[in-house]
């Protein structure tokens, strides 16, 4: 069984005043373009599962163009890969702070029954087609208890998809906004008990344990673009992209996109 792990798409992100010939903010167009390239690569890889681990959008109320872009690309993915399961969790940028606001991410669950969205509160999702359980943990409100990280022993494969800060995420002396009251200790998650732990929130591809990774964002974005480039050069990470992971062989491959 193979999965693809993406995170921190930040569709709808805008910066500066430069426009494309079509009148779209240039940085918004850049972010949409790398997402399309990533989806094309994912379709070519034909994985069994696609995990999108938070911050699909840059804001809770994205512009219509960003919503349409995400919907079209996800629908294209599902049409091209009808047997592939898709799991989407909310991140700190696209999780509503008030329950009554609702989440635009729920729209994608309408594509078909193989698109699973967890926008508020953690949830275990059973993917019967590949005998897998996914513990989906979106960005949690400040002070909310951590879930019980317990694999489902009835399933052949157990995976965590978590958007948030895990202890050791940041290099020493690097400040980062939107930090939780306390990061999650790695031993609370217990990656050795899972087949794979997919993380989102940090924009640099980073190995936290042999089977536990931040995949990083697909494009260079604030707040720490220059620090990210420095870290990538220091650790030999070839830019931005996503992860392909083989659950049977425990093998990891990073696919650069930007």
State where each predicted segment sits.
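Cap/insert and terminal regions of metallo-dependent hydrolase folds
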Residues: 26-35, 186-189, 195-198, 229
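Binuclear metal-dependent phosphoesterase catalytic core
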Residues: 123-128, 215-258
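A structural signal for the main folded, soluble domain(s) of proteins
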Residues: 1, 31, 36-44, 135, ...
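Conserved beta-strand elements of the Class I
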Residues: 4, 133-135, 241-243
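Structural beta-strand/beta-sheet cores of well-ordered domains, especially the beta-sheet scaffolds
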Residues: 7, 158, 195, 210, ...
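His/Asp/Glu-rich metal-coordinating catalytic cores
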Residues: 49, 60-213, 217-223
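N-terminal active-site segment of His-dependent metallophosphoesterases
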Residues: 1-68, 73, 82, 148, ...
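Glycine-rich, flexible loop segments associated with nucleotide phosphate handling
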Residues: 26-28, 32, 86, 184, ...
